[in-house]
Regions:
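Sec-dependent N-terminal signal peptides
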Residues: 4-14
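Cationic, hydrophobic amphipathic alpha-helical membrane-interacting segments
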Residues: 13, 17-144
């Protein structure tokens, strides 16, 4: 799961677009891909370990604060994701998520992203927030 969340972040950075009319669709693709992977990953983790709900909710709250900022720091987002206690998961299904994240990365075509551009990571952060929320709802550890 930790590898999946890390791959999601890598995907988000590499799939960012340039400041053209296509940026909106690239942002939408990033957000929806990250959201889907985060939903599945969160659900998988919390189904196996519902006691991790507090850690996921804390990460979600921190990501909400980051999303509201003018500038989003990749390393801060990366640190939040890597603090999640998912390295203890024993599920073989995690391989499916890693493969899915890799396919999303390849689909993005690996365009470069300017880490200094304030909004470059925003779609990924929004996708992470929404995905964590949806995964928590599906796992039954959070109410709407």
């Amino acid at each position: 799961m930790k590898k999946v969340m890390t791959m999601i972040l890598v995907f988000a950075v590499m799939a960012g677009g340039c400041a053209t009319s296509g940026e909106r669709s690239a942002g939408d693709r990033i957000e929806s891909g990250v959201r889907a992977a985060a939903t599945i990953g969160t659900y998988e983790a919390l189904t196996e370990r519902p006691d991790w709900a507090v850690a996921f909710d804390t990460a979600r709250q921190e990501l909400i604060e980051i999303a509201a900022a003018d500038r989003i720091d990749f390393y801060l987002v990366y640190g939040i994701v890597n603090r999640l206690p998912v390295n203890e998961l024993k599920s073989d299904r995690a391989v499916v998520y890693i493969t899915a994240a890799t396919l999303l990365l390849e689909e993005a075509g690996r365009p470069s992203v300017d880490l200094e551009r304030p909004g470059a990571l925003r779609p990924a952060v929004i996708g992470l927030i929404t995905g964590i929320e949806q995964g928590m709802l599906l796992a039954g550890v959070r109410e709407e």
